[in-house]
Amino acid sequence: MDRRGLLTGLSALGVVACSRPGPSAAASAVPEAFDLSALEARDGGRLGFVAHDLGSGRELVWRGEERFVYCSTFKMFLAAATLLRVQAGEERLERMIPVAATDMVPHAPVTGPAVGGALSVEALMQATVEVSDNPAANLLLAAMGGLEPMRAFYRGLGDADTRVDRFEPEMNRLDGDKDTTRPLNGAANLKRLLVDADTPLSDAHKALLLRWMIETPTGPARIRAGVPAGWTVAHKTGTGGYGPTNDIGVLYPPAGAPVILAAYHHGARETPPARNEAVIAEATRLALSELGRA
């Protein structure tokens, strides 16, 4: 689909249009404590959670200031940073980047078959957002000059807390505060890029990023499992092999303003992955019920 067709299609869903909130929705929310301790106790993990209703302005928060390893949720922000480079004339969507055997790290569903050839910048972004391809993320980081430009990207959003310390897959390994964020930062960054009227992303590039986030097949048992039928979910998952199970995104109802949601669950190492995912789904259901959006 071309850029114009993509933008038209997302507008028809109400995704682009309802990403332009009125003054009341754009106002700063006052965080409300949203006690999820019972949910944590049931599965023995630690959950950081934010649900921001852009219609009412209510923002439900649990452990919003605590740090969590973000894992692959960062990849949608990496794509956004790359799109801003395209807008600035520093990068081109169609530029081909060689893919070598030495670039390979675990989880390479798109780049693995491309070894010895090349993929476009756009294809690498799509791969890293839709199917969380790790070499694609590293190639995009290298293309922008390493980790410092990503740090600058977050600072440009007003986020001085999110850490960017390592490449894939090392960034998924718990090591103090390295490669961590706070749930309130994750939610605020989503709002700044995908909802605010003065987002730095152009309409076409925002629509492109949203399409990848909507079409991703990852994490169907996380946020998606907790929303009512008929809602559109644009999200990005992140998973560590020792318990971290994350999902962040924007939830678009059939009518009305969207809800921003950021969930970072650090489950116990021995907890089955399905149970860790169910925690996020249940927290989503509880939040939407509390907000009167269920």
Q: What would you call each of these model-derived segments?
A:
Residues 88-113:
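Short, glycine/proline-biased beta-turn/loop segments that scaffold the active-site neighborhood
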Residues 2-8, 21-36, 143, 194-220, ...:
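Structured C-terminal helix/loop/strand segments within mature extracytoplasmic catalytic/sensor domains
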Residues 104-139, 147:
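Conserved catalytic neighborhood of penicillin-recognizing serine enzymes
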Residues 22-69:
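Beta-lactamase-like hydrolase cores
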Residues 138-197:
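Mid-domain, small-residue-enriched loop/turn segments at the edges of structured enzyme/sensor domains
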